[in-house]
Amino acid sequence: MPSLLSLYRKILFGRKPGWDQQPLPTIYVQASNVMLSQEKIRQYAEVCGFEFDGVTLPPTYLYVWAFRLHATIFTHKAVTFPLLGMIHLKNSISVFRPVRSDETLTVQCELSDSRNTDSGLEFDLVSKVSVADELVWQALSTYLYRIDTPGRRARPPKASEMAWQDVKQWRLTEDLGRRYAKASGDYNLIHLHPLLSKRFGFERVLAHGMWSKARALSQLMTFIGDKPFQVDVEFKLPVFMPSEVTFGFESIENGKRFEMRDVKGRRPHLQGNVTYL
């Protein structure tokens, strides 16, 4: 399995000519005989709010490993635009059974589809994790390489009309991104320190979108238990740190709907659904 630090060196310091206005080809990568670290799992569970019993993985943890293959694809010569110009729009994870921390895994990732949109180039990365020949976990991530369109203004997203249950309020400290990076191995500079995020146009450090998804899902695990399920999220407004956010959910047919919002409960950062398979 490739090191994210070495991949980020290529991503940050390698030169890309820019998007050539062409769809992307299919790109496939695989890592076999992947073994997990109990210590890293515990760190991840702690920073994301999961209870780790030493056996069953937090459902979002395997994304940490899938993203290493995503980063490998991002360094492919056919990807002619920089990683730092991309936006993670949405993510779907399907858990077909609980995965044990001592299992040997095969992780596959494929850039499967790309399409031109008014906002730029959208593309999908499909990730699969297998134990022997059994598919146990799958994810679909949709990214956007955005292009600026003169005169085009995006409307800010609005929170949904949701009957919140058991509303939580969380304080996100400025060092959250560094703690998540240590646990996940994902050292994207915009999540680490204000001095680094300012280099990319952000006055404050941003929370990682997949941390937000994991933190939200950790609050719903008492309902999910060991059932097979799918969790879909759309990433809305960025979360700057330090800050406070609110989280709530409601019951829907065959699952839960949830949101992470600003402290006033008006502006959405994350919207998602859990459905049982």
What annotation goes with each model-predicted range?
Residues L195-T246, E250-I252, M260-G265, Q271:
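Catalytic-pocket segment enriched in acidic/His residues
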Residues W65, S114, S130-A132, G201, ...:
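Short, surface-exposed, charged/polar-biased interaction segments
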Residues M1-L24, A71, M86-L172, M241, ...:
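HotDog/MaoC-like acyl-thioester-processing domains
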Residues M1-K90, P150, A154-F223:
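Hot-dog-fold acyl-thioester-processing enzymes
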Residues A31, Q138, P228-Q230:
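Hydrophobic residues on conserved beta-strands that form the core of alpha/beta folds
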